[in-house]
Amino acid sequence: MASYGTIFSAILPVFLVIATGMLFHRRGWLSEETETGMMKLGMNLLAPCLILSLVPGNPALEKLAAAGWAIGLGFVLILGGFLLAWGAGLVGGMRIGSGLRTFTISAGIQNYGFIALPLLIDLFPGNEGPSGLMFIFGIGVELAMWTAGLAILTGKAGLRALVNGPFIAVILALVLNYTGVHRYIPDVVHTSMDMLGRCAVPMSIFMIGATMGRFLREGIFTDALRVGLSSVIVRLGLHASLILAAAFYLPLPEDLRRLLVVQAAMPAAIFPIVLARLFNGQPRVAIQVVMVTSVVSLVTAPFVIAWGLGKLG
């Protein structure tokens, strides 16, 4: 079983890169044009290349059922997270118009992607199963976010936004995988995609920090104790327990179980901050959820992952 120290050593560099991105933005070393360009580069080139280098031919996706489980759980577990967050928000005194909607979509969804990915790579060297499944799992997460999540925030879904570079890359990667066409891709093409894809992880983590830095404003700590405590209870307590229960008790492939254990330990996702800003939510609530769960998960995540992987054997 991986020890607390081993897992903490894998997590700490991720948070240091996030802190670096936040520092660069707060110091004004990232212009808005540079930041936008980096995000477009990651979304439209680097992330798709990473997906196309990890998914086709991945042993964990040998059976179609593995992809079905991953997508289905990504969707259902996020719906469960939204329900738990809505209930906890009501208990915590939040109401529609005072942050309940934003809290629900923020605390109800974990950072499933580029914070989890380096941990999966580090914890399972030589095994690309959990890493490849993460992107398939992400289809379900994104589907839940752009349907139920956006409906909670605005009253209507936004499926058009679901069709982006990574989504298209996942669909293409699954087609290549299950048709066997990936075997005929020249090595030079695969090597090039792998090189570009490896750039996606550090740059995306850096940009997570930059995005967090962008939304840090005066007054950000107003009502932070109530929101922060509620978010920890939901994201790192109730929702984490739901994800772990799925990992332990459903008839899942082993690599998907491992992925879920890591997912359970993750802090809240950062993208709801952007959604709250774009769709007249309350970005202050979203950034409080992200900041507090990120700090707390730095301590709790190694315990959760070590215990969860130990229980899986």
Model-derived regions: residue spans:
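Alpha-helical transmembrane segments of multi-pass small-molecule/ion transporters
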Residues: 1-313
